From Swiss-Prot:
Catalytic activity: N(6)-carboxybiotinyl-L-lysyl-[protein] + acetyl-CoA = N(6)-biotinyl-L-lysyl-[protein] + malonyl-CoA
Superkingdom of this protein's organism: Bacteria
Keyword Acetylation: no
Keyword Ligase: no
Phylogenetic classification of the source organism: Bacteria, Fusobacteriati, Fusobacteriota, Fusobacteriia, Fusobacteriales
The protein's name: Acetyl-coenzyme A carboxylase carboxyl transferase subunit alpha
Family listed: Belongs to the AccA family.
EC number(s) per entry: 2.1.3.15
Compartments, as annotated in UniProt: Cytoplasm
Alphabetized Pfam families for the sequence: ACCA
Domain spans labelled CoA carboxyltransferase C-terminal: 34-288
Amino acid sequence: MQFEFQIEELEHKIEELKKFAEEKEVDLSDEIAKLKDQRDIALKVLYDDLTDYQRVMVSRHPERPYTLDYINYITTDFIELHGDRLFRDDPAIVGGLCKIDGKNFMIIGHQKGRTMQEKVFRNFGMANPEGYRKALRLYEMAERFKLPILTFIDTPGAYPGLEAEKHGQGEAIARNLMEMSGIKTPIVSIVIGEGGSGGALGLGVADKVFMLENSVYSVISPEGCAAILYKDPNRVEEAANNLKLSSQSLLKIGLIDGIIDEALGGAHRGPEDTAFNLKNVVLEAVNELEKLPVDELVEKRYEKFRQMGVFNR
């Protein structure tokens, strides 16, 4: 990322010193440690003051952990479940049964790809109606077996293709919103990267909604907003700022319940540390939600979303 050029220079110097020390068999550990300290200080200063559009760039970083990465980090005994039982399986959404610290969960999330082949297979994390219907099937299964649900949101948006529209994209998302509001089991949703519009909401009606520190959640991308609203693609930074899409902005206006700290320099630099923080937040939230009677749990979830956007003088 362009705004990290100073960090990249320091990391390049660190790698050069490591290589030189190995080749010449000399001890340069003190010099390397000093450079690492400089890098860490520079990272903290930079990431404490990112602009909204810089956070958008971090949320899209190609090395940022995806749903299956977090599943590998925080769960055991994961069994993936496939298909919507109506038409086909959509690999842009993955889900299944797992354990987190010995506790049974149903876990569901958007999945992007890393290689070009994987990106095409996963449709860049943009789900078709079949993906949302698969998710709904898993929600209902979790309710039937009294399993808490954990969802990961990471999509630029629902797939807008002609076939998706023919198969009822709008209906599939709308039905998920309706059904999730009444599912009789605890639901925790976490935005781990991009939270793009209705495509994100299809997995986002939950008792507790959290965002990773450098994730974003918005009705439209900054690029789309700049093109449609300002008729100027160069105004993406202004659009990002006006959309209030960062975790910090959304926490202030009450649209999310909390922010999960990422590793220094973003989740892509410390995926295991970020996953550890995420796991602790999930377990704490679920333990709290399970203390509520089911009817009260559902009523509070419904009221939580009904209150969003209400204007009080």
